[in-house]
Amino acid sequence: TMGNNITESTFMLLDNLLKWTKSQTGRMNSVFQEVDISEVVVFASKMSDLVAQVKSIAVEYDIPGPISVNCDVDMVKTIMRNLMSNAIKYSNEGGRIIISVRETPTHARISVRDFGTGIREEDIPKLLNPEIHYMTYGTKNEEGSGLGLQLVQDLTRRNGSELTIESAEGEGSTFTFTIAKEQPRSETVEDTSGGIARP
C-alpha cells in the first residue's frame, strides 16, 4: 500500500542519514564475519518486496548457490536495500529487476539490474560526488537525493570493494559491487574518514 511505501522510504532515509553521519565522523566500525553472501543478498532484497509490488515490478534472482565470503553483514544489507530502492524507483510499472551473484576465485560479484529510465553517461559521476547535490525523480516522481548511492559507495569501500555503474538512458542500469572471500587480516581497519575502525 501507499502507507507501507512511505513508511519504508522514511525508515530508509533516516537509516541512511544515521549511517552517513557515523561514516563521516569516523564512528562506523566494520565487523567482518564469514557468511553465505547469496543468502544475505536474497534476504536483504526481499525487504523491498512490498515496494516492488506497488509498481507491479517482478524481481528475478540469478544466484547459482552458496558462496562463502567475509563481510560486514549489516553494511551489505544496507547496500542491497539502497540498490533495490534505486532500481524500483527508476523502473516503470510492470518492469523487472534482476539480482545476480557470481563467484570468482577471490570474490563474489553482486549485481542489481533494472530496465528503467537509465542514466546519462555524463550524469553518473554526479551521483557519487558528495560535493554535488544532484536531485533526480523516479518514474512516479519519487524523489532521489543521491545520498543512498553515496552511502553505498562508502560501504562497498569499507568491505574492500568499489561500486561500478553501467547505464544507458532509456534502457536501464546495472549496479555492481564485489565482496572478498577473505578480508586482509589486521588489528585495525583504517577508517577512510580519518578515524580507526576496529574489526
Region roles according to the model:
Residues 119-132:
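Short conserved segment of the HATPase_c
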Residues 132-143:
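Glycine-rich ATP-lid/hinge loop adjacent to the conserved G-boxes
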